């Protein structure tokens, strides 16, 4: 047997012994009349941060705190421990003479991970450590698992994602990411509410999967005896509300796409979509750059952020460039001079790009070349405008060039962070595009848009000129927290079950 295998077996044996000892201590405590799960409520006077941030006003005063034991050091008839609450850690000092013999024996039975409530006076040790001199304590919960403190934190990414509850206890930086995530979403709402937008909720279960090119999750409604889809976007219901007279609406909600997983994709994720009547995609550009700058300033204190070692300046205005011009700038090919689909496909092959289907149209090739060869170069915030109509079934055509649409995507660090249109409000054009998508679907494209007759009917009632915007909230949080993977900003990311 190799040394590494022997070490693994030894670690498992040691862990099993530690778990056995914890359950033994549980039984000992119960034999002493202590029920480790018996207290329903514990009143605190303060949090650790209150005392550490305002020591002068707390010195010598009696306080009551609660938290999880994170370190524990015994020296005969005196012990020190650190307890952790939601705001941080604080040291406690437990002395035999202060708490009594029985209580001190109980304290000696406690382990790292146990949750206790303490009452005592605030003082500083000789080394200057702010400490609670405990006069009384109560065991609020006995932990039967061993926290990985001996390895100075939980390091295995897979285990961190599966046991986020342990990750949050052990790694303070992880807690900060999710606290900041909450602040980011609050700042988004604040920004939009201040501009007169109305937050709404729309259905999660759809009879037609629409609003994006993505494979849906399918479920079955027993009472109606029909298959339904978990939503892949928020778009079509929100635009129905624009038709209904709500001129500024937004929703922040979960959407679900039955697709692959990587550092930027999780099957369920949080999406912001907003729609505003009587504006266009230029208005959405201004709103997007202002929103990003507002959130960065609110959460990080600056419109300049550091992402993966690169400084990103979110200060408006951002660079604006058409997709065709971006390809010309970074690849050296001018698609304005390409006349036919066949010529476009040849260019893709010459660039060693794999065609997704043999009959790809010029607009689809343009999007392919951009995705594969240009996107990665867009490090500083950039609006890429005027997408081909073939890849934009819900966007309005440009009047001066109907082969392209009034659509943009925003890119930061080579990644798409926002997608917006001047929304298509011509019901006849929309139906024709749905029919084309339907033909693609029948030809085997599972991501092609389904026909939505009710949405066509809504457009026939009449939708005013409208600008729409979608922002992946998780990706926004990644940038604002300098997180490498989307799994680092989702509390419980999708994971394959262990065998």
Swiss-Prot record:
Coiled coil: none annotated. The keyword Magnesium applies. It catalyses: tRNA(Lys) + L-lysine + ATP = L-lysyl-tRNA(Lys) + AMP + diphosphate. GO terms for molecular function: ATP binding; catalytic activity, acting on a protein; lysine-tRNA ligase activity; magnesium ion binding; transferase activity; tRNA binding. Its cofactor is Mg(2+). Keywords: Aminoacyl-tRNA synthetase, ATP-binding, Cytoplasm, Ligase, Magnesium, Metal-binding, Nucleotide-binding, Protein biosynthesis. Pfam families: tRNA-synt_2, tRNA_anti-codon. Mg(2+) 2 binds at residue 416. One of its GO terms (cellular component) is cytosol. It is found in: Cytoplasm. Homodimer. Belongs to the class-II aminoacyl-tRNA synthetase family. This is Lysine--tRNA ligase.
